[in-house]
Structures are given as C-alpha cells and as structure tokens.
C-alpha cells in the first residue's frame, strides 16, 4: 500500500472551482506506477485505467489523499486500485474517487 497527499492549489482547479479531473488522473497514474514498480522491482507501463468513478468534488485548499494497493497479480500484468479522499482538519476522510489501473 502506498499513500500520497496533496494540497489543492489554484493550478489544480478547473473553471468551475473544483479539482481538474485531468490532474487527478495524473496523480492516480503516478501512484499506480509507484505501487506496481515496488511490487515488480522494475519498470512498468500503464495499460489502462478502468472504472474511473468521480463520486464528489474537491475544492481549493482541500487536502487530497490517494491510497494505492495491488488487487490482482497475473503473469504479465497487475491491477492497482487507487482510492482518493478529501481529508478534513480532524483527519476524517470522504471518498471522492476510485479507479482501477492495469499495469504491464
């Protein structure tokens, strides 16, 4: 399991005042890459991002937490689930996204 945390800044926000979906997709891909490289002990490539579900928005100055874990390992590929949360000042987290990334 790997966890990364980000503070949402103006450069991460779209024209509607929410986290830009493309930015979140980049963070998901990077985290899935780290998780799978640690498991494989070598280089990997993203094959696909499946089932990318946006459940809620995130806004300027929100703390974003991404948690990645391997859910399947095959002979030539693996699947990484990445859950994304907004964390409040008390440490409570609410899910805003879940994605499954296939790495080869």
Where are these regions (language model features)?
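HotDog/MaoC-like acyl-thioester-processing domains
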Residues: 2-4, 59-60, 71-104
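Active-site beta-strand->loop segment that positions catalytic residues and contacts the acyl thioester
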Residues: 48-63, 69-75
């Amino acid at each position: 399991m790997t966890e990364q945390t980000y503070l949402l800044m103006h450069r991460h926000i779209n024209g509607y005042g929410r986290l830009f979906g493309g930015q979140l997709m980049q963070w998901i891909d990077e985290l899935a890459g780290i998780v799978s490289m640690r498991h494989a002990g070598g280089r990997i490539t993203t094959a696909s991002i499946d089932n990318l579900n946006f459940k809620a928005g995130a806004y300027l100055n929100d703390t974003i937490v991404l948690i990645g874990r391997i859910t399947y390992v095959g002979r030539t590929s693996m699947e990484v689930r990445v859950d994304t949360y907004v964390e409040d000042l008390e440490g409570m987290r609410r899910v805003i996204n879940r994605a499954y990334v296939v790495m080869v």
